Amino acid sequence: GKTRHSGLEAQTRYALGELSPALDNLSVYASYAYVNAEIREKGDTYGNQVPFSPKHKGTFGVDYKPGSWTFNFNGDFQSSQFADNANTVAESADGSTGRIPGYMLWGARVAYDFGPQMANLNLALGVKNIFDHAYYTRSYDDNNKGLYAGQPRTLYLQGSMKF
């Protein structure tokens, strides 16, 4: 059916070393998106929020980059959303209707860049959802119904090379 999406996005990054030499290699960043996604199909659900479309999403964090190392701490959030066109608040037993609560997740990552002498090999170790917050996310199947448990605390190893 017909929908209308309007909103705004903003992002910023600031190198704190510009404030004081003691803060060299330290930067902060943030991004934010507001989306007003409404159903525009005539009928009982006209004007309701489009399912699985949170109004607010964002991220923020801090990077510290001394030499070849990078240390990062970040947070990601999103507001609540609905699982159906009717914007039903109460959750059904199968999760196909109801409000999906918003959530906030924290992550951290440490990386080392070996530089051009090793083909710019970069190795990183990180953790997503540090506090193992239980949350729900939307389904990604073809019928677009239901909830899935969000990713639990996850430790990861990452590598990249330029060649």
Task: Give each language-model segment a name.
Residues R4-L8, P54-G58, G102-W106, A119, ...:
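Residues that define the transmembrane beta-barrel architecture of outer-membrane proteins
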Residues S79-N87, Y112-F163:
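C-terminal beta-signal and adjacent terminal beta-strands/loops
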Residues L23-S31, G95-P101, A119-G126:
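Glycine-rich, flexible loop segments associated with nucleotide phosphate handling
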Residues G1-A86, S160:
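Gram-negative outer-membrane beta-barrel transporters
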Residues L16, G98, A108-Y112, M161:
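Outer-membrane beta-barrel pore domains
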Residues K42-Q49, S92-G98, D142-L147:
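Extracellular loop and loop/strand-boundary signature of outer-membrane beta-barrel proteins
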Residues P21, S53, Y64, R99-P101, ...:
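Surface-exposed coil/turn segments at beta-strand junctions on protein surfaces, enriched
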Residues N74-D76, A83-V89, A93-I100, G107:
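Extracytoplasmic gating/loop element in the C-terminal half of outer-membrane beta-barrel translocons
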